[in-house]
UniProtKB/Swiss-Prot annotation:
Transmembrane segments: none annotated. The active site is at H95 (electrophile), E167 (proton acceptor). Belongs to the triosephosphate isomerase family. The keyword Cytoplasm applies. GO terms for biological process: gluconeogenesis; glyceraldehyde-3-phosphate biosynthetic process; glycerol catabolic process; glycolytic process. Keywords: Cytoplasm, Gluconeogenesis, Glycolysis, Isomerase. Its EC number is 5.3.1.1. This is Triosephosphate isomerase. Substrate binds at N9, W10, K11, G173, S213, G234, G235. The keyword Isomerase applies. Gene3D superfamilies: Aldolase class I. GO terms for cellular component: cytosol.
Length: 249
């Protein structure tokens, strides 16, 4: 049985003070709750504060990105050992905004996935198609390429721990979410691809999230789907009550 996982991606929102305020309130709301796994991914600048506040809770800390090298002359980048030092358990890799604004390629994402596993971070690996690709019937082609190139060279013992977030690019931050059944079909496709690369057992262990304008009103539609194991939540995770309503749905 795959445990459900709800992750908050705060993107470029919240100062340290705002992070502290959110976590204190959210800790009160979620006290004693352990049914689903909860992950909070604040900006890099708030990771230290978040780590200190989450130490006495089952809530996991995640980062929104990382570089693939351990250290070096990479101005502005954050390494996996820096994330481990801050007690991060998860790291988001390949988010569509990174692909779009920072020209991240499947090859770069593959390097990041390998590095995350090397330093015992669990990747939340994002895949998803653009609207024009969906309109042209290319969803399967795009997802297949992203999954295959992203996972290239990774052993199955590592892949079975991964979380894959299906985030249709056209649904992110737009207020337009995919329908539950459509998201479930893509989740099935992802499992089929993993089964072809590795085996059925691995494909059944991988947890798949839906992301893209998830909110308290539509979360149940996604969690009711057989192949969807949680959500990667953007804007609706910025307020403690809203995020808590999603978690406990």
């Amino acid at each position: 049985m795959r445990r459900k996982i709800i992750a908050a991606n705060w993107k470029m929102y919240k100062t340290c003070a705002e992070t502290e305020s959110f976590i204190k309130e959210f800790k009160e709301l979620s006290k004693g709750y352990e049914e689903k796994e909860i992950v909070i991914c604040p900006p890099f600048t708030s990771l230290y504060v978040a780590n200190k506040l989450l130490e006495d809770t089952p809530i996991k800390l995640g980062a929104q990105n990382m570089f693939w090298e351990k250290e070096g002359a990479y101005t502005g980048e954050i390494s996996p050992i820096m994330l481990k030092d801050l007690n991060c358990s998860y790291v988001i890799i390949g988010h569509s905004e990174r692909r779009q604004y920072f020209s991240e390629t499947n090859d770069m994402i593959n390097k990041k996935l390998k590095s995350a596993f090397e330093y015992e971070l669990i990747p939340i690996f994002c895949v998803g198609e653009k609207w024009e690709e969906r309109e042209k019937g290319k969803t399967e082609e795009v997802i297949t390429e992203q999954v295959k190139k992203g996972l290239q060279g990774l052993e199955k013992e590592k892949v079975e721990k991964i979380v894959i977030a299906y985030e249709p690019v056209w649904a992110i931050g737009t207020g337009h979410s995919a329908k539950g059944e459509d998201a479930n079909e893509v989740a099935k496709l992802i499992r089929r691809i993993i089964s072809e690369i590795y085996d059925e057992e691995v494909s059944q262990k991988v947890r798949i999230q839906y992301g893209g304008s998830v909110n308290p009103q539509n979360i149940k539609e996604f969690l009711a789907q057989s192949e969807i194991d949680g959500a990667l939540v953007g804007g609706a995770s910025l307020k403690p009550q809203s995020f808590w309503d999603i978690v406990r749905s």
